[in-house]
Amino acid sequence: MKPPSLLVQSVVQWLVHGARNAPLSQEVLTELCERLTAAGLPLWRVTVFVRTLHPEIVGRRFVWHPETGTVVTDGSFELLERQSFLDSPMVHVSNTGESFRRRLADPDCVMDYPVLHDLRDEGVTDYVVAPLHFSGGEVHFSSWATRQPGGFTDAEIEAIQSLIAPLARVAEIRAWYRVAGNLLTTYVGKDAGERVLAGHIRRGDTEAIHAAIWLSDMRGFTTLADTLPPQDLVDLLNRYFDCQVPAIIEHGGEVLKYMGDGLLAIFPIGAERDFSTICAAALEAGRAARDQIAALAASDGNGSGLRFGLALHVGDVLFGNIGSGNRLDFTCIGPAVNLAARLEKLAGRLGRTILASEDFVDHCGDGGLQPIGRFAVAGFAAEQMVYGLADEGKDAL
């Protein structure tokens, strides 16, 4: 029989040339481990942990077991502070970039980490943690466990070591593609990020779309900025946006940009969601945000008296790349956006929390909106009929 190091050579070749065809990273690890066990490696559990760039997630953990396949979990930043992580071999490997091995079948094995006792109780006889070195110097890690009596043989350890470098290359390519998606989603939004990642990056690349438009603003922000310490102001702004963004996303909207204390979002209209459905969803998101902000204003000392204004409109917008040279913005423009901006200012003058255009109400139906009157709007020749919520009057919030 061929030694394991020779048997896994075909697996290494697949990892280098064939793994890229798998659509999901967990599928790569599953097939890798299945190929290795078929080649004779006595694997009981394999783990790969790769750090990422994400505002809420420190990294992704892939755990393969022959009975469950590969299970993926996202690790929050709190993971780095947990004692179970701090007291693990992973920290040693991440800090030193060196492999770690404990042959747990050996009665004299050094049990210098709590996890080793847990592994031995599970019947693990050998445990290897190998660093995955990325080209930028970052160190991630993989772990390999067996229940084979006596642990891994020297040839099996050699076979595992031969996999580490190609596994690191595959993991890095997939990790950076995911990082690119994470960063684009974080800073330009999911739909816009997917468009950019798909290659829509030339200046002037735009698409005309139908959308409900959301433009909101914090009332009295200048006064708050003048009275609050800078960090308290930032914290308040974040909590203020926390009241809006989840509601927008849950109702099918896409946040395009933050403008100081302002927020621009769209609710795209397509074959699956028509005008009336989208406008009703945008209005419900507005109500949810209003209620959340009212609760924040009542409970937060710094947010006492916090006020919110929102304009809702519907129309055609140009969605795409606008800017200069190699500094572009993926946003939306057009007369419909301009009108939404004017209505948002009008809402402040009228003491209204939510103001909607006539076009929006035509598509939304009543929805609890009532006419307020016609008003002159800068930049538009005709006066605009505007609507407000029936359940609030002037200075409702």
List the model feature ranges, each with a label:
Residues 317, 340, 346-397:
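Cytosolic regulatory/linker segments at or just downstream of nucleotide-handling modules
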Residues 238-252, 269, 273-310, 335-344:
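Alpha-helical scaffold within the catalytic cores of cyclic-nucleotide enzymes
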Residues 67-125:
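Regulatory sensory and allosteric helical modules in signal-transduction proteins
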Residues 145-161, 332:
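Regulatory loop-to-helix N-cap segments in sensory/regulatory domains
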Residues 156-208:
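Regulatory cytosolic signal-relay segments
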Residues 48-79:
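GAF sensory/regulatory domain recognition
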Residues 200-284:
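Catalytic NTP-binding/metal-coordinating core of nucleotidyl cyclase/transferase enzymes
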Residues 125-133:
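Short hydrophobic beta-strand micro-motif common in sensory/regulatory domains
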